[in-house]
Amino acid sequence: MLSASRKLNNQQFLKTIRNMTTFRSEFDTFGEVKVNDEKYWGAQTQRSLENFDIGGESEKMPLMVVRSFGILKRCAAIVNKKYGLDATIADNIAKAATEVVEGKLDDQFPLVVFQTGSGTQSNMNANEVISNRAIELMTGKRDFSKKLVHPNDHVNKSQSSNDTFPTCMHIAAAISINEKLVPALEMLLAAMRTKQNEFNHIIKIGRTHLQDATPLTLGQEFSGYCTQIEYGIQRIKDTLPRLYNLAQGGTAVGTGLNTPVGFDVDIASEVAKFTGLPFKTAPNKFEALAAHDAMVEVSGALNTVAVSLMKIANDIRFLGSGPRCGLGELILPENEPGSSIMPGKVNPTQCEAMTMVCAQVMGNNTTVSIAGSNGHFELNVFKPVIIKNVLSSIRLIADASVSFTKHCVVGIKADEKRIDQLLHESLMLVTALNPYIGYDKAAKAAKKAHKEKTTLKEACLSLGFTTSEEFDKWVDPSKMIGSMK
């Protein structure tokens, strides 16, 4: 009932707004469409808005894709000018497109991800907005006649949605990785390195199979986390060469129909110049339109990073469990109250947030994998959902890494007293006796100590396996940590 009531209220609200708003008539090949007079978009955007009412605000096309369309249309205007497009038209298209890049026209891009799988409506959204804004820049007034600047003939000149959308996918992902993700992971890595060095002298008990194992230093444990993050950064960077290949110039099916020779090379060069990233034309446009293996590869690398961060965050929160009845080897920063019923309780919230992010990224990767596998013949038609999920994963990992660094990692402290207590209570120190009394006797001593709840030393002395001096000499945790840093 509540849902139905809200829906009715929304409908009444929209009806009221319509009554207050003036509309103009726009026309496309399907006929007349009414468009809000305050909007720059045209008939095709309006049809998409009405035909794909799916998901609402939360499912709108990511702004990075919108901004990437601005980059692409600006660069296309510059290149088309070289190939004969009227200079005044080209220059004003470029100016309008630059406003898209700068975010000045964000409210003119209302479409959701769940539309045509080629992203055609979003491409036309960009074409319509840029053409109408370009006319306004030329004349000083709004004119929706399309006579001075046409969305298809001018803004979309030498282009197809089938090559513009995948090009924008690559631009958006590459910029996001370079400007947001890599710096965030490098920040996390630096903080982890600091902790590794800080903890290098602290000898603790290791754990395998969730059971006590032989000693290592806390710094060595953190060095493993550092290497996971370092490899993750490298994996992400290793995907970039394929992302820098742009589909633009393939037009409808990859043949380059209706584009001048050299257009593909020139526009990739212009995009590279504008972004400062080494974009180049894709060597095979058929692959660039029909498959999105490069995006699947990126998503796979993001998934691997999520797997690493899940392990790291879980280890840290388990090592910080307590404060009285857990492992308690790490003291985590206390950022906020943890319970509405248990006074004084504090939880490892940054670790929990990170692990939830990792779970989401793993889910995103499943979506991208399925979508990437659905390239049929000359075109993959899952493009919008692929880029939505890739950008979501990039943003989530980047934001979570910064948050985890600032509010958790930099403030982690070691409880050296607790660590030393657990170290000397561990029966796995018996491993150091193997070379002196043999595996079988060492195992017998460990089992006796565990069963009788005595120390390992007491068990060895009781069994006559070692003297007190021999035990102290042979069972020295500082000699059991190896030379690995």
Swiss-Prot record:
Presequence boundaries: 1-19
Reactions listed under catalytic activity: (S)-malate = fumarate + H2O
Enzyme active site: H209, S339
Pfam family, one: Lyase_1
Keywords associated with the record: Cytoplasm, Lyase, Mitochondrion, Transit peptide, Tricarboxylic acid cycle
CDD domains for this protein: Fumarase_classII (cd01362)
Residues annotated to bind substrate: 118-120, 150-153, 160-162, 208, 340, 345-347
EC number: 4.2.1.2
One Gene Ontology term from the biological process aspect of the record: response to bacterium
Pathway: Carbohydrate metabolism; tricarboxylic acid cycle; (S)-malate from fumarate: step 1/1
Record flagged with keyword Phosphoprotein: no
Gene Ontology terms, MF aspect: fumarate hydratase activity
Subunit structure: Homotetramer.
Family per similarity comment: Belongs to the class-II fumarase/aspartase family. Fumarase subfamily.
Free-text function comment from the UniProt entry: Catalyzes the reversible stereospecific interconversion of fumarate to L-malate.
Protein's recorded name: Fumarate hydratase, mitochondrial
Organism: Dictyostelium discoideum (Social amoeba)
Organism taxonomic ancestry: Eukaryota, Amoebozoa, Evosea, Eumycetozoa, Dictyostelia
